[in-house]
Amino acid sequence: MKRPDYRTLQALDAVIRERGFERAAQKLCITQSAVSQRIKQLENMFGQPLLVRTVPPRPTEQGQKLLALLRQVELLEDEWLGDEQTGSTPLLLSLAVNADSLATWLLPALAPVLADSPIRLNLQVEDETRTQERLRRGEVVGAVSIQHQALPSCLVDKLGALDYLFVGSKPFAERYFPNGVTRSALLKAPAVAFDHLDDMHQAFLQQNFDLPPGSVPCHIVNSSEAFVQLARQGTTCCMIPHLQIEKELESGELIDLTPGLFQRRMLYWHRFAPESRMMRNVTDALLEYGHKVLRQD
């Protein structure tokens, strides 16, 4: 059985994290040549490339598996050492999460664990359609995703759903939708997307108004909180989780522009198996809180 030296795995990890050999060498306090030698040693052991030497470098499929193994070992090792050593460094917990979960339910869900356990969070924000890929690549140890199928050697549980409403301010509705939300009116109404891969707004309009992708003008803003601000100030119409704007809807500051129409995103919690005790605590906290505030039907 091939058992890699974890120094060589750490070199591979550093090249990916630091996006190059030079910075990886600085991070590890060794020469760039030593980094290359360690990775070459690892590649010789497995008889195949572990890095695609692009700029920045990226792991091959086998490289991703080894990085995932490293994440699991580091988490279990750090937890064990934490039991044996007083005053040890808090555990680093890298999770891939979508921006809307981060803006609504995720931090309250993690609050009890953060209060009771020595954890350093590293939250990597990614669209919920792509968070699972970070887990696959070994960049994180857990991910909130819309994918229901677990990766090999991973566990998955349903968290619940976020319901997205198509909302805007009353002045915005009066300006752009004086005769209601129609296909022709939507072509002139400015909207917003999180990034160029965010297709929720376009999918909603295509499904309900038969508007093809790219037909509606969209701002690009990488912030869930900014979506709410843009809608409140009458700049755009937006797809926003109901959970995020309950107060604004109740006060009338925002209105549901298409009552009865919404987009539902079911969310799942993915993590490596077996779980460490700390990850079990995180899982329990996320599931307990998620089942309270997210839609379960």
Curated annotation (Swiss-Prot):
SUPFAM superfamilies: Periplasmic binding protein-like II, Winged helix' DNA-binding domain
UniProt domain HTH lysR-type: residue ranges: 4-60
One Pfam match: HTH_1
InterPro entries: ArgP, ArgP_gammaproteobact, LTTR, LysR_subst-bd, Tscrpt_reg_HTH_LysR, WH-like_DNA-bd_sf, WH_DNA-bd_sf
CDD domains to which the protein is assigned, alphabetical: PBP2_IciA_ArgP
GO MF annotation terms: DNA binding; DNA-binding transcription factor activity
Transcription regulation as UniProt keyword: yes
Entry keywords, A to Z: DNA-binding, Transcription, Transcription regulation
DNA-binding region in chain numbering: 21-40
Family: Belongs to the LysR transcriptional regulatory family.
Self-association and partners: Homodimer.
Function (record text): Controls the transcription of genes involved in arginine and lysine metabolism.
The protein, known as: HTH-type transcriptional regulator ArgP
Organism (species): Citrobacter koseri (strain ATCC BAA-895 / CDC 4225-83 / SGSC4696)
